[in-house]
């Protein structure tokens, strides 16, 4: 894939909402939210952000590459842990300002806490309490990342 001029210029509303050209809208920080979901189960795995270059890299290699807002660097998911996310499909919303990545999660999980999903708790309706939703740890993050 040619990495230059990958994305179409943003056109009018009709072109953005109904057209056949991918022209993502990045926010004022140059980022677009990307929700990774298991391609088979549709379970939400994690929410991360991409900049233009990380999205290009993702399209080129077929694996999720994010932009780390805290470290200010590219984050090839699984480069350290081996828990890569193979891209099955990328969807964009009507405004092309948010992405859903349907992925094949390789390895024990997507979450740095050792769980398959970062969404392992739910808010009890009408309260501010959280309850676990089956988020047992599937790997030891200290062993994988070398951090306590």
Residue map of PLM features:
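C-terminal binding/interaction regions
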Residues: 2-31, 37-41, 45, 50-148
């Amino acid at each position: 894939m040619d990495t230059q001029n990958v994305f179409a210029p943003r056109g009018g509303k009709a072109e953005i909402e109904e057209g056949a050209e991918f022209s993502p809208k990045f926010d004022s920080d140059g980022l677009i939210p990307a929700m990774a979901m298991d391609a088979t189960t549709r379970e939400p795995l994690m929410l991360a952000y991409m900049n233009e270059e990380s999205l290009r890299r993702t399209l080129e290699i077929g694996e999720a590459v994010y932009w780390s807002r805290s470290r200010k660097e590219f984050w090839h998911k699984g480069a350290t842990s081996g828990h890569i996310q193979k891209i099955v499909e990328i969807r964009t919303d009507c405004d092309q300002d948010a992405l859903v990545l349907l992925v094949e999660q390789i390895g024990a999980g997507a979450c740095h806490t050792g769980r398959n999903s970062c969404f392992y708790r739910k808010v009890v309706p009408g309260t501010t309490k959280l309850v676990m939703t089956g988020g047992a740890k599937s790997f030891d993050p200290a062993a994988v990342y070398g951090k306590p």
